[in-house]
């Protein structure tokens, strides 16, 4: 199935290729930079543990509400009309309000401070703050509508295109069923990876692309790219990372398998029809292991594509052509 939202850097155009390169066996699947969840939603549910994570609290809250409070979310969507640029701006301001928290949060924090001693008081306050960040249906509904009505789903400018929000009700119910057994997290990538790392874990990482970080709401600096590499370098499990193809990323991940791939550049289609965007998939395992286990008919089908260069720990080899 498709995601309920479009999102910057979404992997709809690349996900079939990603599935073919996932490990053959794993017991837990973790999307570290979940975004719109396109890879997760398109992946057939299985018996393994699934985790969706994004450091953007609005995204994590939206998917939490889709999973845990679908009826309340649908109700809120019905009562949030959006017919003009002014209303769009109002909703954006609404999402950034510091007061946009549980109406009882201040009282609960005060009670915890008054009746508990340290360090228990701090621990309880942290739990209360974390709980207040998720399950906020009004915020989820406002964020969902901002995405739907903004230009290019970028959440920054009004798209001017009419859209009937009621058409998404079925999609939300389908997403609710798909997320039934999925854990929703809102953590920094390093903390999340260390929490879920096991020898049988598989982490799919789709971080903000290098030197395009300004298109994302969450700040991601050059040192964060290095921190991600260093974190992944020490894990017990397996990982795959998708990035834009550039010299810096290739150098940063030179000790791992790197495969060059391309996808249609949706943002450029209006001005340059057929334009493609170069990307790389990076892994700490042999990405061809799943493809080699497939029937010959599937391998023959994959031959209808152009040849790709694979870099594996400093060595370059030619791989079978892939359908991109």
Where are these regions (language model features)?
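Short active-site oxyanion
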Residues: 4, 25-29, 48-49, 179-183, ...
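Short loop/helix-cap segments at secondary-structure boundaries that form the rim of catalytic
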Residues: 42-46, 194-198, 248-255
